[in-house]
Amino acid sequence: MSKKPTVLMILDGYGLNEKTEGNAIALAKKPVLDKLMKDYPFVKGNASGMAVGLPEGQMGNSEVGHLNMGAGRIVYQELTRITKEIQDGDFFENTQLIKAVENCKKNNTALHLFGLLSDGGVHSHITHLYGLLELAKRHGLENVYVHAFLDGRDTAPTSGKSFMEALEAKMAELGVGRIASVTGRYYVMDRDNRWDRVEKAYAALVDGEGVEAANAVEAVAASYAEGVNDEFVLPTVVVKDGKAIAPIKANDSIIFFNFRPDRAREITRAFCTDDFDGFVRKSGRLPLTYVCFSEYDVTIPNKSVAFEKVSITNTFGEYLAEHGKTQARIAETEKYAHVTFFFNGGVEAPNEGEDRILVNSPKVATYDLQPEMSANAVADKLVEAITSLKYDVIIVNFANPDMVGHTGISDAAIKAVEAVDACVGRAYDALLSVDGQMFICADHGNAEQLVDYTNGEPFTAHTTNPVPFILINYDDSYTLREGGCLADIIPTLIEMMKMEQPKEMTGKSLLIKK
């Protein structure tokens, strides 16, 4: 039998930083947490970048942190998932991408690659286009054309020219691909049914009509000279001997490498819908092999999807319910959605046997005015839940280090950490009184850096710092391994509870024999 209850305590925004300047966690008097880190197994865990499914070097956040924890696996966003598949090589075996390539081989037709030429990472990423060019090269395709949509919103307003030059260099290096047209996202990525804009983009792509230029870099330079930046570049076709070099024709293949749906739908409708009524298509719907990077809209026909959405099944909450275990989720308002909706993989409804205990956050303009927030009331509910012995598992979040950390006010953040430390002490005493077990962690850093080390200004964002993992009152013959991440926490709890990890969870338990 395992000990009961098993408590997962999340100290929101409690990161670990070796510098003490602007570090509310180092500057706070926190006798309880200091003692627990000394007396019990303690390691640093990774809560940012690829370790939580975000781009390398990107700070973690509460939504992503709780999603990864509850899932017991790294949950990759589309951006990182596709990037990772390119790195791992799975990308080059993707069934739908291969289908587009094979169609070109069979019909001796062109492969058109279009999407937002940008490293903004919001709608697309230029490295994904490079992956597609590599795919075309591996298959020996010769008629490969890029239709570049220029950004200037998620990137600098005139960065398009440098992206274009980088793309030209990559195509020269690979020996495959030519830029056939250039269009500002204003025209081709509308999302408000402004079909007059989309029509201009479509005319350039299919009919070879629009502003004419000898090459893409020249087209962009000319647009800048007119005072028109990336977002608003008029649909422009690259011409040779007065004719567009590569209008899209029947039986061609298109791969649209935007992964965010909202601004990819309209142009996709224009290509794929049989009874399209946004504007008149001169040739009607062209028969094409049209592949979208993600599912833009299930109602759009005549297309396929390269990267289907991954649903998160068998989260920790589901798993506990399936095994007849009881669970409590406790948080104040600010973090209530995180310990419920996000922890459950984006599912709103509670699981069987899951009690949700909400404590109202204080009604103040900013939390530096009340840095203790509602931590004491959360601790009251937590102590009550522990000592009731009603629950097999209790998941609790203390919001203070994050919410007060966001104000950038050091004195308040120090008080916030001290308030939480006292609450941890109360929970620890209650836990020992019933011989329960606990794992303390954080979802990302924040309160440990309240100053920008480059310029001395207040720093109010999350960080990429590691977070604490502390194992409380489990089994003295075990310790924790280094190098873990948030996805490893639930597999650890499952082992602590002497249960079997489900196959959907790919995180690895942090427990190791001493």
Curated annotation (Swiss-Prot):
Q: Which InterPro entries match?
A: Alkaline_phosphatase_core_sf, BPG-indep_PGM_N, Metalloenzyme, PGAM_B_sf, Pgm_bpd_ind
* Pathway the protein takes part in: Carbohydrate degradation; glycolysis; pyruvate from D-glyceraldehyde 3-phosphate: step 3/5
Annotated substrate binding lies at 123, 153-154, 185, 191, 260-263, 335
Which CDD domains does the UniProt record give? iPGM
Which residues are listed for Mn(2+) 2 binding in this entry?
12, 62, 443-444
* GO MF term list: manganese ion binding; phosphoglycerate mutase activity
Per its record, the protein catalyses: (2R)-2-phosphoglycerate = (2R)-3-phosphoglycerate
Q: Which HAMAP family match?
A: GpmI
Name the chain's protein.
2,3-bisphosphoglycerate-independent phosphoglycerate mutase
Q: Which species expresses this protein natively?
A: Lachnoclostridium phytofermentans (strain ATCC 700394 / DSM 18823 / ISDg) (Clostridium phytofermentans)
Encoding gene, per UniProt annotation:
gpmI
